[in-house]
């Protein structure tokens, strides 16, 4: 089945005991799990980028009625199926890209979107598509680089204002042209401000931040005029929302001339 990235405990046998991040992803899960009910009875879960199945298995372990794990890598899917079957968990694993999420019917009570965002060449598109599958809790995690601080920013700036772009806490992402950590699929890595700003832009409300790379969110304003933001964008109908007293061409209508 090849080398494992998830260090699973399969009946006392660990699949990646020498992982460079330690007992990964259990080290993250121990901080995140406190935000998830002990019982998920009757709930559905979508695990996007499921890898070896760690999070799918943990959600099923809590009694989720239906868990679907998707990934684009057959090696990881085979590992996940093996782990779930060996541990006696009925979990559906399927080959599917984040860009194909619309092919999966319905929505899910929990969407796990962890360890995927920074691997996407089109990360905001991937996030918007993932949000469409969330009927309830949305769990987001991304590698972060740059400042871990956040700041307060105006809702608009004039064309001539540019000093904020030099502030390390301003929302920003780093583009990786070739490789990072020997991985050519590490495309975009946000700072903390950018991660939180993009979650809000996708219509999510941040509920908690249990781990430095992870946020627990709920859908709040994912629709405009009854349609998802990404669908409006594809249709060429995503006009900016004009705030009261705001001139979208660069100034305030209430400003003294």
Regions picked out by a protein language model, each given a short descriptive name:
Residues 1-107, 114, 156-157, 161-163, ...:
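Conserved N-terminal segment of class I S-adenosyl-L-methionine
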Residues 74, 120-121:
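A structural helix-start
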Residues 99, 108, 112-113, 121-251:
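S-adenosyl-L-methionine-dependent methyltransferase catalytic module, highlighting the catalytic core
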Residues 117:
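Conserved SAM-binding site of S-adenosyl-L-methionine-dependent methyltransferases, i.e.
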């Amino acid at each position: 089945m090849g080398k494992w990235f998830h260090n699973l405990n399969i009946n006392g046998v660990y699949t990646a005991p020498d992982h460079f991040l330690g007992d990964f992803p259990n080290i993250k899960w121990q901080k995140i799990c406190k935000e998830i009910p002990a019982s998920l009875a009757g709930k559905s879960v979508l695990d996007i980028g499921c890898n070896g199945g760690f999070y799918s298995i943990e959600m099923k372990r809590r009694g989720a009625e239906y868990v679907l794990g998707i990934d684009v890598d057959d090696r990881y899917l085979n590992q996940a199926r093996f782990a779930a079957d060996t541990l006696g968990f009925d979990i559906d694993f399927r080959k599917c890209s984040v860009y194909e999420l619309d092919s999966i019917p319905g929505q899910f009570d929990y969407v796990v979107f962890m360890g995927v965002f920074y691997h996407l060449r089109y990360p905001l598109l991937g996030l918007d598509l993932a949000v469409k599958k969330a009927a309830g809790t949305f769990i987001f995690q991304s590698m972060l680089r740059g400042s871990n601080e956040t700041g307060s920013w105006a809702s608009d700036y004039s064309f001539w204002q540019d000093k904020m772009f030099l502030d390390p806490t301003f929302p920003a992402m780093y583009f990786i042209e070739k490789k990072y950590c020997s991985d050519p699929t590490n495309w975009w890595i946000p700072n903390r401000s950018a991660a939180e700003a993009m979650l809000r832009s996708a219509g999510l409300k941040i509920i908690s931040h249990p781990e430095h790379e992870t946020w627990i969110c709920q859908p709040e304003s994912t629709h405009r005029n009854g349609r998802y933001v990404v669908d409006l964008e594809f249709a060429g109908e995503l006009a900016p929302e004009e705030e009261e007293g705001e001139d979208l061409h660069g100034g305030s209508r209430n400003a003294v001339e």
